[in-house]
Structure formats: structure tokens, C-alpha cells
UniProtKB/Swiss-Prot annotation:
It comes from the Bacteria. The active site is at residues 157, 161. Pathway: Amino-acid biosynthesis; L-lysine biosynthesis via DAP pathway; (S)-tetrahydrodipicolinate from L-aspartate: step 4/4. This is 4-hydroxy-tetrahydrodipicolinate reductase. NADP(+) binds at residue 37. It is found in: Cytoplasm.
Length: 273
């Protein structure tokens, strides 16, 4: 698409929503809409003032349906139930979506897959360029080490995060499991307590830390005899996630209807490991 994409932000009043508004402005794209819950006291507020960048002439709306016609693409970092409703509206209108909502159920993910047969959808647990490059490195490490190491995923986030493990940790685990020909649902071990017995090398362990204002940290350990390799990504602010999501929004407009991920956006699927 040659013209600057018209981008709508859902959950505009949240921390991520405000950062997304800033990212749209920094990228030079058009903020076409900002949406909050209809009962929110922020409805009617200038979206730019809300995000701390000054007036942009876009008022926060309490209804996605009312502003959808003004948008080429919607960015949604809200909650699973809300995202499911937004998908239905965007599917009917043929408006592209970029979804960063985590904690979705298998049923909700199936609904997303179905909607993506009607309108293009980018879905990723993490839109950071660094995280997605890290995942490519994890695939390489898993391919080289194979079954000769124990694998542990450790993630840390702020005290307000409600889902665990993080979507990014699971995304990393899935990438490793797929590379090794394992089913993550069968081999994942979430935390350990009591007499657990010897470790099964086929398993992939997950540990979760919640506290303070940690934006997001992920470390994957490939632990062998006499050595270990660690791949770590640390986010110090939310702008890297927001900038990646805005990049995905500009990329997906005009694409054929299907589900994409950040590896598609960044061209990482073309990089062989």
C-alpha cells in the first residue's frame, strides 16, 4: 500500500495502548482511531493528549464499530474475550488486524484462525524485533544440540501481568519443541516442587517470575555436561513492542487474507538455520 496506513488502536488508555499511539506518530503514520471500553472515563479525550504527545485531533471512542470504516488496520493488545469480539467486527468489515493479546484459549485461537481466512491477521505473542531474532537463534541452538542438553525457559515480568508463563516464553518453547520434533503440550513442565525425581531430558522446563516493574525478560538455557549456552532478551521499555506492532500494521495492509506472524513481517522465514 503506497499511502500511509490508517491505524486504529484498541485499549488506547492502557500502558501499551498509549505507547502504540506514540509509536504510530513516530513512524509517521496516520492515527485513524483510538478505542476504549464504552464505560471508560477516557472516551472523548484526545488520543494524543492521553499518550502525552499533544493533541492529534482524534478523540477516544467507546465503540470500534463506529470508527472501523476509518481504518485500514487495527492493533489489538487488549484481553482475550475483547479480542474475540473485535475479530468478528474486523472480519465482517474486511479490516486487517495486528493482535498481541496473550492468554487466548484454544477455542479463541481457532476463532482467530477462522477469521484470518476472511481478512489478513498478524498474530504474535511478542512484536519485538529482538525477541523474534532470538527465537531464530533458539531454533539454531536446538537444531545443533538436539537431545544432548536439558532445556529451561525462565521469564520475568511486572507484578500486574495476569498470565503465566508469558506468551513469549511459550512461543520460545514451541519454536524449540518444533525444531526437535516434540509436542510442547506433552513435554512442558511448569515449575517444580517436592520430590520430582531425575529430570527427563525430553522435557522443556518453564519458570515464572513476577515482580515490580519488569517490562519483560526471557532466558533460555541449553544445559549440557560441563557447559551451557544461554540466550537472553531483556526489554527495558514497551516502545520496542509497540514499534514492531506498528511495523506489522503497515506491512499487513493489502496482504491476502491469512494468518501471519512477525517472522513473516521481518522476513525471518527466509533465513535458514
Amino acid at each position: 500500500m503506497s499511502a500511509a496506513p490508517r491505524i486504529g488502536i484498541l485499549g488506547a488508555g492502557g500502558r501499551m495502548g498509549r505507547t502504540l499511539i506514540q509509536a504510530v506518530q513516530q513512524a509517521g503514520y496516520q492515527l485513524a482511531a483510538a478505542v476504549e471500553r464504552p464505560e471508560s472515563s477516557l472516551v472523548g479525550t484526545d488520543a494524543g493528549e492521553l499518550a502525552g504527545i499533544g493533541s492529534v485531533g482524534v478523540k477516544v471512542s467507546g465503540s470500534l464499530a463506529d470508527v472501523l470504516k476509518d481504518c485500514d488496520v487495527i492493533i489489538d493488545f487488549t484481553a482475550p474475550a475483547a479480542t474475540a469480539q473485535h475479530l468478528k467486527l474486523c472480519r465482517e468489515a474486511g479490516v486487517a488486524m495486528v493482535i498481541g493479546t496473550t492468554g487466548m484459549s484454544d477455542e479463541q485461537k481457532a476463532e482467530l484462525d477462522e477469521a484470518a481466512t476472511h481478512t489478513p491477521v498478524v498474530y504474535a505473542a511478542n512484536y519485538s524485533v529482538g525477541v523474534n531474532v532470538s527465537i531464530k537463534l533458539l531454533e539454531l541452538a536446538a537444531k545443533v544440540f538436539g537431545d544432548t542438553v536439558d532445556i529451561e525457559v525462565i521469564e520475568a515480568h511486572h507484578r500486574h501481568k495476569v498470565d503465566a508463563p508469558s506468551g513469549t516464553a511459550l512461543m520460545m518453547g514451541e519454536a524449540i519443541a518444533d525444531t526437535l520434533g516434540r509436542n510442547l503440550k506433552e513435554v512442558a513442565v511448569y515449575g517444580r516442587e517436592g520430590h520430582t525425581g531425575p529430570r527427563d531430558r525430553q522435557t522443556i522446563g518453564f519458570e515464572t517470575i513476577r515482580g515490580g516493574d519488569i517490562v519483560g525478560e526471557h532466558t533460555v538455557m541449553f544445559i549440557g555436561e560441563g557447559e551451557r549456552v544461554e540466550v537472553t532478551h531483556k526489554a527495558t521499555n514497551r516502545m520496542n513492542f509497540a514499534a514492531g506492532a506498528v511495523r506489522a500494521a503497515a506491512w499487513v495492509v493489502g496482504r491476502e487474507a491469512r494468518k501471519y506472524d512477525m517472522k513473516d513481517v521481518l522476513g525471518l522465514n527466509d533465513v535458514q538455520v
